[in-house]
C-alpha cells in the first residue's frame, strides 16, 4: 500500500456464499464463520467490539434452523483484568448483547500467553471453517508487537489475520507491513498520524443495500422508499 493509505482484509476474508432454492428460499452453502479475538479490553478493544457488533452479520446465519445449528460470528475478548473491565462495559451497554442473536461474545479473564489460550488459538487456526483474526490492542507498542509476532505458529501457517496496535508508524511497523513470508497477514493499525478519512465513516453503502432489500422483499412505506431512492440516485 502507499504511504498515505493502508489496506486491510475484511474479517470475512473468504467468500460466504448462499444459494436460492427452487422454492425461492435461500440456503447457506458455506459453513465458514468469522472469529475475532480481541486482546486487551481497553478503550481500543471496546471500540473494536462495538464496531464488530455493528457490522459482523453474515448471510449464512439462518434463524430457521435449530438454535445450536445456526452459524454465528464469534468474538472472544481476552484481558488479564477482564472482570473489572467487563463490569465497566456492561454498565455502559447493559442490553447490547441481548439484542443481537447472530453473534456470540465470550469474555476471557486470562493472559493471551497462557497455555490454555495458546491451545485455543491453535485449535481455532486449524479449524477449516474458522476465519480467525487476532487484534492485539494493548497500550504498550513494544509489548503489542511482541505479542502479535509470537502467537502460535499455526496462526501464521494457516494464514489467519493478525492486527497489531501501534500509536505511531515506525520502521519496524513498516517492515511488518511489507513482510511477505511468515508475517504476510500481519498488519499494524491504530496510528494516530494516520487518522480515518471522512468518507470511511459514511454509511451510505449500507443504506443502499437496505433500500434495495426493502424494495424487493418488504412493504415499506412509500415515503421512506422515496427518501432512500433519492440518496441512491
Question: Where is each model-derived feature located?
Answer:
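Cytosolic regulatory regions of ion transport systems
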Residues: 1-233
Amino acid at each position: 500500500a502507499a504511504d498515505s493509505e493502508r489496506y486491510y482484509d475484511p474479517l470475512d476474508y473468504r467468500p460466504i456464499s448462499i444459494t436460492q432454492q427452487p422454492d425461492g428460499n435461500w440456503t447457506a452453502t458455506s459453513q465458514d464463520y468469522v472469529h475475532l479475538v480481541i486482546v486487551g479490553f481497553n478503550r481500543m478493544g471496546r471500540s473494536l467490539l462495538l464496531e464488530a457488533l455493528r457490522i459482523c452479520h453474515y448471510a449464512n446465519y439462518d434463524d430457521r434452523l435449530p438454535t445450536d445449528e445456526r452459524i454465528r460470528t464469534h468474538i472472544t475478548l481476552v484481558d488479564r483484568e477482564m472482570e473489572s473491565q467487563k463490569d465497566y462495559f456492561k454498565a455502559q451497554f447493559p442490553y447490547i448483547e441481548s439484542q443481537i442473536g447472530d453473534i456470540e461474545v465470550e469474555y476471557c479473564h486470562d493472559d493471551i500467553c497462557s497455555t490454555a489460550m495458546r491451545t485455543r488459538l491453535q485449535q481455532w487456526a486449524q479449524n477449516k471453517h474458522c476465519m480467525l483474526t487476532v487484534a492485539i490492542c494493548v497500550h504498550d507498542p513494544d509489548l503489542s508487537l511482541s505479542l502479535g509476532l509470537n502467537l502460535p505458529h499455526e496462526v501464521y501457517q494457516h494464514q489467519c489475520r493478525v492486527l497489531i496496535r501501534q500509536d505511531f508508524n515506525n520502521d519496524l511497523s513498516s517492515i511488518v507491513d511489507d513482510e511477505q513470508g511468515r508475517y504476510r497477514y500481519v498488519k499494524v493499525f491504530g496510528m494516530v498520524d494516520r487518522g480515518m478519512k471522512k468518507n470511511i465513516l459514511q454509511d451510505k453503502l449500507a443504506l443502499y443495500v437496505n433500500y434495495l432489500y426493502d424494495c424487493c422483499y418488504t412493504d415499506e412505506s412509500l415515503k421512506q422508499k422515496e427518501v432512500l431512492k433519492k440518496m441512491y440516485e
